[in-house]
Amino acid sequence: MSNTTVLLDKKTTEIIKATVPVLKEHGEAITKHFYKILLENNPELKNVFNQTNQRKGAQSKALANTVYAAAANIEKLEEILPHVKQIAHKHVSLNIKPEQYPIVGKYLLIAIKEVLGDAATDEIIEAWEKAYFVIADIFISVEKEMYNEKKNQIGGWTGFRDFKVIKKVKESKEITSFYLKPDDNLPITTFIPGQYITIKAQIESEAYVHLRQYSLSTAPGKDYYRISVKREASNQPIGVVSNYLHTSVEVGSVLPISAPAGDFILDERDHRPLVLISGGVGLTPIMSMLESVVEHQPNRNVVFIHAAKSIDHQAMRKRVSEIAKSKEQVKQYVVYSNPTNRTDGDKQGYIDYEWLKEVIPTKDAAFYLCGPKPFMSAINNDLQNMNIAQNDIHMELFGPLEPIAK
């Protein structure tokens, strides 16, 4: 990566560094305008970008954070490589192509000029054009490597491949699992617990294709994939695809999906105790990790903590209980915020610092968190207050990348 940075001369680098305060102040306004003009002039890209995230402003905020990070680290772009890889996983799952980068660059530069006005001099625009293509080349290089890796794996593929629903199981009041096997009956690639697939939902009533990522919710090594989807409110934009899956997709339905991707992954080389903490549908990648660790690391101590509204909202409750009862090294704790009965669960209300201290046996452990952003932010703060090293805390947020740790 350091080889790419030499393509930027000293003058360009200094100009980019000088714009960092401007990006901090106006970055989100620039990226909001960028998406507006990009999609107005390239409506076919609405088939790629999540329109719900566009309406909520989440995508523009995530892009603003990325642009700011790149500018702030323009002399040492290797510092943002973990962030680049995280985004690249998402890009590969969406089948983003190298030829789309110049289109994005064109409208990003237009947005910078139109939002900043006279402050965006020709010199600044020229510097950002150079910087953008250096950064784009880094993404393209990382993504090319990922595409090649997927293509060359046994059962691997790039782009989208048709899978047939072979089983549909209602797991709770809101969550249903879909078991998927390739329509061509050929092998499928394995995955690392915690990864996701992207579904291409072609809904008759919708003008554009919807692409959605769903975590794989079982251990790898099977001849099928399983996703477990929460049905969102049908009157909300966020619920378009989940309602389609719950109401219109049945056994025999065919769904195009991309190969597994994502960097929220279980490190099976680590033999320290494992603490898995999930909230709501954040259970799905955590369940994959639990299933995998009891299969491949049967002697590893595991603390499984799950927060749900009630017993009716807790997906895969019986399976987790079976594991905890049959595996002495697995300890299960369930917290209900709105329990049906006073005796339900190990705790009523919410996970808090004092309770967490009691159920976590050691600080020297690997922690994996998944759930709503406020949930993860609170748990992360509690763990840091317990002096857990940030490097030992791994988190997955469904949706555009946003900072969680303070």
From Swiss-Prot:
One of its GO terms (biological process) is nitric oxide catabolic process. Its EC number is 1.14.12.17. It catalyses: 2 nitric oxide + NADPH + 2 O2 = 2 nitrate + NADP(+) + H(+); 2 nitric oxide + NADH + 2 O2 = 2 nitrate + NAD(+) + H(+). The record marks 90, 396 as: Influences the redox potential of the prosthetic heme and FAD groups. Residues 6-144 form the Globin domain. One of its GO terms (molecular function) is metal ion binding. Keywords: Detoxification, FAD, Flavoprotein, Heme, Iron, Metal-binding, NAD, NADP, Oxidoreductase, Oxygen transport, Transport. SUPFAM superfamilies: Ferredoxin reductase-like, C-terminal NADP-linked domain (SSF52343), Globin-like (SSF46458), Riboflavin synthase domain-like (SSF63380). Heme b binds at residue 91. The record marks 35 as: Involved in heme-bound ligand stabilization and O-O bond activation. The active site is at 101 (charge relay system), 143 (charge relay system). It holds the Pfam family Globin. Residues 155-406 are annotated as: Reductase. Consists of two distinct domains; an N-terminal heme-containing oxygen-binding domain and a C-terminal reductase domain with binding sites for FAD and NAD(P)H. Belongs to the globin family. Two-domain flavohemoproteins subfamily. This is Flavohemoprotein. It comes from Oceanobacillus iheyensis (strain DSM 14371 / CIP 107618 / JCM 11309 / KCTC 3954 / HTE831).
